[in-house]
Amino acid sequence: MKSGSFSHVGITVSDFNRAVKFWWEIFGCPLVGVTDAPPDRVRGFFGVDVPGATCKIGWIRFPGGAVIEIFHFEPKQPPVAIPWNRVGQTHICVNVRNIHKWHDYLVSKGVEIVSKPEQSPRGHWLFFVKDFDGNLIEITDLRHMYYVLRWLGPLGGWIFRRGMYMKYYA
């Protein structure tokens, strides 16, 4: 069996409205759904064993269909710094065109810039920013690789799986 396309990634936020505003005002991604999880669901499904804990869940949609699912729990827990070498999610990535314009735009919006635009050995450009909660966001301009990955990616995956990357499937 094979999966379909990538659907979504979930992040916990400290302020639901601020997260919605951030993703809309900075990236033009609208909130497309909201639900509230009652305490019994928060305890049973999320494993948060705090009396009366609740969770507001929202879905923020990117052009192309991928979604960021945001979770806002009450009561809040303090944020914890997570090192990159810890197993688990490290960042999300947003594809853009014209990396230098995006860098200047994000600076003008007051977004925390972590690194300056740099060119990767494969030719695409990238830099990192953080949202208001410190979640790491990679901004990348794949340039011509966007089309290569989008249209030739499935063929490349098929070829690489049987060739140079076969050892990773063992």
Give the label of every model feature segment.
Residues S5, A53-T54, G88, G123:
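Exposed loop/turn and edge beta-strand positions of beta-sandwich/beta-sheet ligand-binding modules
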Residues H144-I159:
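A short, polar/charged loop-to-alpha-helix boundary motif
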Residues P39, P75, P121, R143-Y146:
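A short acidic/small-residue loop/turn micro-motif
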Residues V9:
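Acceptor-substrate binding/catalytic loop of class I
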Residues S14-N17, L31-G33, F62-A66, H72-L136, ...:
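Vicinal oxygen chelate
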Residues T12-G64:
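Core segments of cupin and vicinal oxygen chelate
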